A protein has these predicted regions:
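Short, surface-exposed beta-strand/loop micro-motifs that present aromatic residues
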Residues: 168-174, 178-181, 188-192
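Active-site-proximal cap/lid insertion segments
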Residues: 1-126, 130-141, 182-199, 204-211, ...
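Bilobed periplasmic-binding protein-like "clamshell/Venus-flytrap" ligand-binding domains
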Residues: 157-158, 230-243
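Short Gly/Pro-enriched turn/cap motifs at secondary-structure boundaries
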Residues: 90-95, 161-163, 169-170
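Loop/turn elements at helix/coil->beta-strand transitions in domains of secreted/extracellular proteins
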Residues: 61-67, 157-159, 174-177
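N-terminal sensory regulatory modules of PAS/LOV and PAS-like folds
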Residues: 67, 146, 163
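Glycine/proline-rich active-site loop of Rossmann-fold NAD(P)-dependent oxidoreductases
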Residues: 136-137, 155-158
Length: 243
């Protein structure tokens, strides 16, 4: 901060007793103040984002500023998030752990108030920013440029397939179909939620809560999604620790 002549916060202490007292209680499932505390944090965040937008407005920059707002994962059960009607939470590959909102604002170029259900990803943010900034999108980027969708040029733009692999679980999404394979429930225990181990096929158009396993009824779908996973994995580049 000194480098940029900014005033330092010399009395700042990350080990604030109030915060740690709360965190100690936060992981208890029956804390009466839990949900209220969570909603208070969300309200505070919303207020702070509003201050940033107000500043952009005051500086005359709001119309020509591209803003993405997205969560990196679904809400966490121990801190009283609620992902219903989606099943699961942070760390897990149920929809409650991986399906999140993405809000995009660019008043100068994008129409306000439009809602899309297209399957997109956080990977798409970088190539979209590159496109708007007239920067060449690197060939090795996995994401795609969303600007044709956001400008209303191509309303059907979406990923045909998305794949996740955490080591504990893997998931493949293709259209309404989803394959989830779960091998280890340690993350679920941390999140205080139930995780069914095994292999599962779900039609998300009819079962957004992932309650019905269609794996025995849909062997062709299973084979197709397993093939998509194999293709995806074969394209991964191995690092120095080649295992």
């Amino acid at each position: 901060m000194n480098k940029y002549n900014l005033k330092g916060y010399h009395d700042w202490n990350p080990a604030v007793e109030e915060y740690y007292d709360w965190y100690a209680k936060g992981r208890y499932p029956n804390n009466e103040e839990g949900r209220a505390h969570y909603l208070g944090q969300v309200h505070y965040m919303d207020k702070e984002i509003g201050l940033l937008l107000d500043l952009l407005e005051e500086q005359g920059l709001r119309e020509n500023t591209l803003i993405f707002f997205i969560s990196d994962n679904g809400g966490s059960t121990p801190i009283y998030a609620n992902n219903k009607p989606l099943r699961g939470s942070k760390y897990l590959l149920y929809e409650g752990g991986i399906r999140v909102q993405m809000l995009v604002s660019y008043p100068k170029k994008y129409e306000k108030g439009k809602v899309y259900q297209n399957m997109v990803s956080a990977m798409d943010i970088l190539p979209s920013i590159c496109k708007e900034a007239n920067i060449k999108i690197p060939d090795y980027i996995d994401g795609m440029d969303l600007t044709p969708l956001l400008k209303g040029v191509n309303d059907s733009l979406k990923h045909d397939v998305l794949v996740w692999d955490t080591g504990h679980e893997l998931a493949v999404r293709k259209g309404p179909w989803k394959l989830r394979k779960s091998f280890n429930d340690s993350e679920a225990k941390y999140e205080m939620v139930e995780l069914e181990l095994g292999n599962f096929i779900t039609n998300l158009n009819t079962d957004i809560g992932e309650k019905i396993n269609l794996i025995k009824k849909e062997p062709v779908i299973l084979g197709d999604l397993e093939k998509e996973y194999s293709v995806w994995k074969s394209k991964l580049e191995k690092g120095d620790n080649k295992k």
